[in-house]
């Protein structure tokens, strides 16, 4: 298998991402404000450079484990994580489909641009399908 990083995002969740700026939790409760985690959007992120090797290692291990378990994954996936204040990743979900983290940059991200300027997730998938069709291997990339 192989790994290409096409993008990184940060999920915005209703009020939990900003509540700490509003004051003491006790006062907020008095006002009837309670933290919520409703997803309201996603923001593109350029990861701190020192974290990139860890991110790639997690991705590579995911690809390797998928090969061991069921012959590998086809297409994009996203490791949904939190980062501790010790700069350690904690994975809480794997999304094996096109999600915000894999498709946030419509015309390519700084990471996808390293593969080819303007490369989006959709364009990358289309390229793989065209290549497989031309070489008679379409059955290998479709599920």
Where are these regions (language model features)?
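Conserved metal-phosphate-binding beta-hairpin within the catalytic cores
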Residues: 64-103
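Cysteine/selenocysteine-centered motifs that mediate thiol-based redox chemistry or coordinate metal-sulfur cofactors
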Residues: 123-143
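ATP-dependent carboxylate/phosphate-activation module, predominantly the ATP-grasp catalytic core
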Residues: 1-65, 95-122, 126
């Amino acid at each position: 298998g192989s790994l290409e990083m096409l993008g990184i995002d940060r999920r915005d969740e209703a009020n939990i991402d900003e509540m700490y700026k509003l004051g003491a939790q006790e006062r907020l409760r008095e006002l009837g404000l309670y933290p919520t985690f409703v997803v309201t959007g996603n923001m593109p992120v350029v990861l701190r450079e020192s974290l990139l090797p860890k991110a790639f290692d997690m991705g590579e291990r995911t690809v390797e484990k998928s090969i061991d378990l069921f012959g590998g994954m086809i297409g994009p996936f996203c490791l949904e994580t939190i980062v501790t204040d010790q700069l350690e990743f904690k994975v809480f979900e794997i999304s094996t489909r096109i999600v915000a983290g894999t498709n946030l940059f419509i015309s390519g991200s700084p990471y996808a641009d390293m593969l080819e300027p303007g490369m989006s997730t959709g364009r990358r998938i289309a390229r793989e399908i065209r290549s497989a069709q031309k070489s008679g291997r379409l059955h290998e990339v479709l599920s």
